[in-house]
From Swiss-Prot:
This protein is involved in the repair of mismatches in DNA. It is required for dam-dependent methyl-directed DNA mismatch repair. May act as a 'molecular matchmaker', a protein that promotes the formation of a stable complex between two or more DNA-binding proteins in an ATP-dependent manner without itself being part of a final effector complex. GO terms for molecular function: ATP binding; ATP hydrolysis activity; ATP-dependent DNA damage sensor activity; mismatched DNA binding. It comes from the Bacteria. This is DNA mismatch repair protein MutL. Belongs to the DNA mismatch repair MutL/HexB family. The keyword Manganese does not apply. Keywords: DNA damage, DNA repair.
Amino acid sequence: MGRIHVLSEHVANKIAAGEVVERPASVVKELIENSLDAGAKRIRVHVEAGGKKLIHIVDDGIGMFRDDAMLAFERHATSKLKNPEDLLSISTLGFRGEALPSIASVARVRLETRANEEPSGTVLEIAGGKILKIEEAGLPLGTSIAIKDLFFNTPARKKFLKSESTELSHIASLVTHYALAHPEMHWELHSATNALLIAPPVATQSERIYQVFGNETLDQLIPLAAQIKLERIGLPKPPPWLRKNEDDEEEQTVEPGEVRLHGFISKPEIQKLNRNSIFVFVNGRLIRDRLVQHALTEAYRNILPPTLFPVVLLFLEMPYTEVDVNVHPSKTEVRFRQQSLVHDFVRDSVRAALSKARPIPQFISEIHAQPKASPSLTPGAQTAPAFALEAQEEPVLPERLQFGGDAISVEANAAVPVARFGAQTFGSHVAQQQTVPETSGCDYELPDLPAADAPLASLRPLGQIRESFILATSNEGLWIIDQHVAHERVLFEKVLKQRAAASVETQQLLMPLIVELTPGQQAVFTEIAEELHQNGFEVEPFGSRTFAVKAAPAGIRAEDIEKTLSEVLDSFEREQQAFNLEHAQSRIAATIACHAAIKVNMPLTQDKMEWLLAELAKTEHPMTCPHGRPIVLRYSVKDIQKAFKRI
């Protein structure tokens, strides 16, 4: 007896569901695209338990006839394609006929639909791929489809779903994408507890951006519009002896068309921790294409730090024959016929828009100095050589080194510049004040590294390099300490201890700070609201997706409170793991410490440097900051002796 057999249709549908239905957001995506293909002008999405318990989508599209409603749940049944040639120019969002049968095979489905020409509608109920009921009913024009108990018959798939807030944030992000792409439509997203998004139709995309992100984000966006002619490329003609007839010798000339790009890109002042705010559509289709992502990365190179991302809303439009959307089960990846042309066009168009707007990145700013903190580090007549442990000409030193003195002032909201510099040979004069980069976002990897054996408590601070790095000495050699990340480690462990003892220090705001959250951030906030409160944030609802911050952790400047809260929510929004309380506490503490810590380009007195080194020595892990960056560099006496050729 043979070993190979044909799978039953029921099993085949479950396998297909594994490709199409990855999570609740995948179901929402397929159903929304069906509604858009049906010409809907109003779409309402309601979910419960992050979509695990219920996904209910209602639209006012053209609806379906009774026979079509039944046929729609058959595999590869579609109204979008008829001939093989149609695959070469797909103009609809759906076309395979896989989504509905795949969803119905792993969930309980109730479909209510009525076409405009029909006096009554059709109600269809399916569970696990089996039709339970079909009947006529009086229904409004359009379609309503409810998906209950997703993966109820495949527990192995269900256990791999993330927390309710994580799944809800994915759904919120998806609906936000389509709401931005279709400002002419009415969109609603509701969870079991509140409304995450209500966006009435508007005339322009900028008005829709205002609805979703608020006026502050809109003011930081740059409009973009560009177009380019496509090149005429194709397969070479066959030689004359292989042509079927002489009439085919001259091929009909067809204009290749144009590629058009329009939308909005953000100035460098807006910096996100993840790519969730990058919205790219190709012919109205939401994509996550590596080619376009790389083009955007190249366009923002040397403008944004490599670990941070812009806000982007871009629409690529081109002939349907120039893009293949049938390359991935979820249809989020595409293949362009002229990849290099599309990549360079996107990159150069974004660069040109940034250059035309002449934005001044927030992390490049000047230091307005008073008298310098240390006479020995004041500008001199000679240019400072690069730092090296190689023998050089002996610099002219003052008779006596002094540290301390008056401090300089930094503007309250002056951001951190990005400028390369060479460190000094110890004791040389500094020719001019230069600035040092500081990471303006936080990468939330929290390694648990062992504490170093170095006797940090015995360090004696000598001064600062660029008012950003503390130079210290001990019997073991020369030490360089990054003052920002050192203080960050001190504050991180302090916040965790205060949280454990329920004695977190807070600061009451004179006036509540009004913060508007995105739908995805609001979904995360619902999950971690109590933990935020335990860490010093006092936040109350103040309308739809708007919250009033009345108190915040002590040490965070007033102008940084909104950014701190936003970074916390964004970091959880990109989280792929189930919610873990201990991990959440560490993540929130790390973000608070990052924003409350001493900054670079900040002068410190001798007492402050001694205090910081003493506090760092008391921490459990003094060698790395909470995000994994090194805190200290050490040059041993032996290394220095080797550099001077003494051993």
